[in-house]
Structures are given as structure tokens and as C-alpha cells.
Amino acid sequence: MAKVKGTKKLNKAIKKALAPLGVENVKLDTEWSYDFETDTLRYSLTECITDIWFNEYIRDTFRYIVGNTGEDVFLISVLHEIGHRETIDFISDKVYNKCLIEKGKIQIALDNALTEEEAKKIEYKYFALTDENQATEWAVNYARKHRKKVKKMQKAVAEAVAKFYEKNGVTD
């Protein structure tokens, strides 16, 4: 397996692009998350069907088309993860713990899903969990209210990802 090159530069460029939002740490990972203990936004460059479903969920739930302000699903996902940080104090411990339990059940259901349609329904349950929905709502509202900032972030992030892909020989 070839070594991945330029990860530090990519993380640094994304961190710089997200500086207006107070993001201190970013890390390329295999999964998306916001790590509250280390105040780290973890992101993935893996594209999958879930991205399409997330777009559809945003459109159907918030009447927002990803791309309206020039952002792509990657940036709206970044904003979603930041949204977890921004909305965590609005969720009671009881509700948050219930969300964690439901996420475990959802993961088991996804692992056992037999069809794409079944997996989509399960993912929608995940998207609708209180903590996930609030983070997405925050992301959408931020994108709506800060169009110029979002366009600037999108440009910087897209350029950094393109350079990373080029350095690693990734093509469309």
C-alpha cells in the first residue's frame, strides 16, 4: 500500500480555512466526528452513498439545497461537525445519552441492512436524532447567514483537497 502524502499540509489548510469558526484541531480520519475531549474535528475524504442521502435529508428537512452558497457536501459535513460543538449545550445529558444508545442500535441495523433502500431509511433515522439534526440545522443556518464566508471556506478547502489528491495521484 502506498504511503499517503501531504496529510499535515491538508489538515493545516483546512484548519486555516475554518479559523473564523474557532476550529483548533482537524484530523483526516476514516469517519466523521467532533471529538469533544480533544476539541478535534475529524473528517473523511471517502465519498459514499450516504453523502447523497445527507444532501436529500437536508433538502427535505431544511428546504436547503447544498451548493446554494457554493459549498459542497464535504464542507456542509464539516459545518455539521462544528454544529455538534455549537449545539451540545442545548441538549440535556438524558437526551444526548439516548442519542448514543440509538446510534448503537442504528449501527447494528445498518450492518444488517439487506437493501440500499433499507439502509437509506436507517440513515434517515440517524440524521433525525436530536443531536445530529441540531448539528445539521446549525450547519445549514450558518451557510445561509454567512454566504461569503462559506464561499471563501469552500474555495480554500477545495484547493487544499485538490492539491492533496494530486500529490497522491488521485484522479476522478
Residue ranges and their predicted role:
Residues 1-8, 12, 148, 152-155:
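Short Lys/Arg-rich cationic patches that frequently serve as NLS/NoLS or arginine-rich RNA/DNA-binding motifs
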Residues 3-4, 87, 97, 123, ...:
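N-terminal low-structure segments adjacent to metalloprotease catalytic domains
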Residues 18-26:
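Short secondary-structure junctions
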Residues 26-73, 82-89:
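Active-site scaffold of zinc-dependent metalloenzymes
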Residues 85-113:
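Conserved, surface-exposed functional patches that form binding/active-site neighborhoods
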Residues 102-172:
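Metalloprotease/metallohydrolase-associated module, dominated by Zn2+-dependent proteases
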